[in-house]
């Protein structure tokens, strides 16, 4: 999980801090994973460094307060597009719920007879609305995202 903070005197920036907390299916679990925030931040930074010559990104600096060093990034403050991007290789969670009622996930028709945990014929992109805290994200089709 990540939390956002606006640094004093930097209305143009946001400090993104990754925690060791776990969330699944829009719920925060009681347990944590030691150093998860550090690992997530290192992975994110690794990818942002690799794509820097290909596409602009929001990372400004890793020069952050000592209390969050290694698990925070100073980033450009941007307007968020409220979409969660999910790539699925297996049928589970909200995708399974959609499939059981419609035979598809996010408008993508899937073969009949799939079960919880079934491997999909190929990975699929299944966007969801990014709900406010306490509410559940809702799966949507790509046309909804394009609007």
For each feature predicted by the language model, list its residue ranges.
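A mid-sequence, solvent-exposed acidic-amphipathic segment
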Residues: 144-147
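Active-site loop/lid in soluble adenylation, ligation, and acyl-transfer enzymes
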Residues: 1-132
């Amino acid at each position: 999980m990540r939390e956002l903070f606006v640094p004093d005197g930097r209305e143009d920036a946001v400090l993104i801090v990754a925690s060791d907390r776990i969330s699944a299916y829009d719920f925060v679990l009681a347990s944590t994973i030691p150093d998860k925030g550090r690992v997530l931040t290192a992975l994110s930074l690794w990818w942002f460094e690799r794509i820097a010559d290909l596409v602009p990104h929001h990372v400004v600096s890793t020069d952050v307060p000592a209390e969050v060093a290694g698990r925070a990034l100073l980033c450009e403050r941007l307007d968020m597009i409220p979409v969660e991007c999910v790539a699925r290789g297996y049928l589970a969670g909200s995708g399974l719920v959609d499939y059981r009622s419609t035979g598809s996930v996010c408008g993508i028709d899937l073969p009949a007879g799939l079960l919880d945990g079934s491997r999909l014929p190929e990975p699929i992109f299944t966007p969801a609305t990014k709900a406010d805290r306490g509410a559940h994200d809702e799966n949507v089709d790509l046309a909804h995202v394009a609007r």
